[in-house]
Amino acid sequence: MLILTRRIGETLMVGDEVTVTVLGVKGNQVRIGVNAPKDIAVHREEIYQRIQREKQNQEEQDN
């Protein structure tokens, strides 16, 4: 795992097309902005996990 330190307004690059910018810090919450091409899905981890479970459930029902 790469660990980086960024300040508000600073950005990091993921590959050539995805940027992650620190928008704000309030208490233990960090607001980030993600710019990515439309063909790259960006989700919070809990949403991604739910999508994966739903896909798995659908595949099981199809079999």
From Swiss-Prot:
A cellular-component GO term for this protein: cytosol
InterPro entries: CsrA (IPR003751), CsrA_sf (IPR036107)
Chief place where the protein resides: cytoplasm
Annotated Gene3D superfamilies: Translational regulator CsrA (2.60.40.4380)
UniProt keywords, alphabetically: Activator, Cytoplasm, Repressor, RNA-binding, Translation regulation
Annotated compartments: Cytoplasm
Record GO biological process: mRNA catabolic process; negative regulation of translational initiation; positive regulation of translational initiation; regulation of carbohydrate metabolic process
Highest taxon in the source lineage: Bacteria
The keyword Glycoprotein appears for this protein: no
Entry annotated with the keyword RNA-binding: yes
A Pfam family per the record: CsrA
GO MF terms held by the record: mRNA 5'-UTR binding
Record-stated family: Belongs to the CsrA/RsmA family.
UniProt subunit comment: Homodimer; the beta-strands of each monomer intercalate to form a hydrophobic core, while the alpha-helices form wings that extend away from the core.
PANTHER family: CARBON STORAGE REGULATOR
Biological role stated in the UniProt entry: A key translational regulator that binds mRNA to regulate translation initiation and/or mRNA stability. Mediates global changes in gene expression, shifting from rapid growth to stress survival by linking envelope stress, the stringent response and the catabolite repression systems. Usually binds in the 5'-UTR; binding at or near the Shine-Dalgarno sequence prevents ribosome-binding, repressing translation, binding elsewhere in the 5'-UTR can activate translation and/or stabilize the mRNA. Its function is antagonized by small RNA(s).
Name under which the protein is recorded: Translational regulator CsrA
Organism of provenance: Cellvibrio japonicus (strain Ueda107)
